[in-house]
């Protein structure tokens, strides 16, 4: 998504990811891939290495040892510092990157199941009221916005290799997770009621992904692989909980509490995960070295995030969905 940058000061929280841009849509999209793939810059569409599990292309599921059970477990740690003018924000994040298991089926075919984050929401902003007129009437006011949560993907892939060169594969993906976004308006003067409001989203959906790889020997020790993947777009389902309440001293008044069961499946502007097209090419010299280039394109213009409460950003931030393109090497 295309965004207009803004920032206040951040406070410490526990997040799978921390980014001011995760205030919009389903949050910050994970780069995905196993530790081996991430160490190679996130490539994998054209990777064929029997010693490592490749989750970037369903066709690569079949490129493995035909007798062994394989598993991969990864953790992700990230440290970020954001700055804009005199404002500073920093956060250390920690999350599970992936849990994957792969099994041989028959000869040159194999099966894989895995779990990994698809997107993460993690942000926290705080600012003070600057209007002298308002400060003179009601006193100090603090505005806070914070969000957290993750959307995960549970996937199962199957692939097969034909004529030792052509591999094809298919993958079923199930999305699920919870996203919380909250805002506070806190009055220092106890004669005024402070306001807390926000949205809780419980989401799920499913889609499919398809992949192909073709490997060509260039010499006894060198080969070239081309690969392609396509993930179908899908609507998200689930329910929304919009709430607002006012507090004064120890008294809390509920202003709004609305829960809709599976409401997202009944609306014409349901939030949507975009489709994704990926292509890649690699050059490999036995198991000693390899170079690879990947291109990914995803069109989010029909995601409907701008029109859905709980997905659209509020306040002065200007967010819109567009075409996302990624180059990895």
What is each of the regions a protein language model found here?
Residues 8-39, 104-329:
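Outer-membrane beta-barrel porins/channels
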Residues 1-2:
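Bacterial N-terminal signal peptides
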Residues 6-119:
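N-terminal, post-signal peptide beta-strand-biased segments of exported outer-membrane/organellar beta-barrel
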């Amino acid at each position: 998504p295309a965004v207009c940058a803004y920032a206040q000061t951040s406070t410490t929280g526990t997040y799978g990811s921390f980014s001011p841009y995760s205030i919009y849509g389903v949050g910050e999209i994970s780069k995905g891939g196993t530790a081996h793939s991430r160490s190679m810059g996130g490539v994998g569409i054209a990777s064929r290495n029997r010693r490592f599990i490749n989750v970037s292309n369903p066709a690569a599921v079949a490129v493995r040892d035909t007798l062994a059970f394989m598993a991969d477990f990864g953790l992700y740690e990230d440290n970020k510092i954001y700055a804009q003018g005199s404002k500073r924000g920093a956060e250390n994040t920690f999350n599970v990157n992936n849990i994957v298991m792969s099994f041989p089926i028959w000869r040159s075919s194999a099966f894989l199941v895995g779990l990994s984050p698809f997107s993460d929401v993690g942000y926290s902003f705080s600012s003070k009221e600057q209007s002298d007129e308002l400060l003179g009437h009601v006193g100090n006011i603090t505005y806070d916005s914070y969000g957290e949560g993750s959307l995960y993907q549970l996937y199962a892939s199957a692939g097969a290799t034909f004529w030792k060169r052509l591999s094809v594969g298919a993958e079923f993906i199930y999305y699920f997770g919870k996203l919380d976004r909250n805002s506070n308006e806190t009055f220092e003067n106890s004669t005024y009621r402070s306001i807390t409001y926000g949205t809780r989203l419980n989401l799920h959906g499913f889609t499919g992904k398809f992949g192909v790889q073709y490997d060509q020997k260039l010499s006894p020790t060198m080969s070239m692989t081309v690969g392609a993947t396509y993930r179908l777009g899908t609507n998200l389902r689930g329910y929304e909980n919009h709430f607002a309440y006012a507090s004064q001293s120890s008294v809390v008044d509920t202003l709004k509490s609305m829960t809709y069961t599976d409401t997202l499946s009944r609306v014409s502007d349901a939030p949507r995960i975009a489709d994704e097209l990926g292509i890649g090419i690699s050059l490999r010299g036995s198991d000693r070295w390899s170079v690879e280039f990947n291109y990914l394109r995803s069109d989010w213009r029909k995601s409907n995030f701008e029109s859905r409460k709980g997905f659209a950003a509020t306040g002065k931030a200007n967010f819109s969905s567009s075409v996302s393109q990624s180059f990895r090497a």
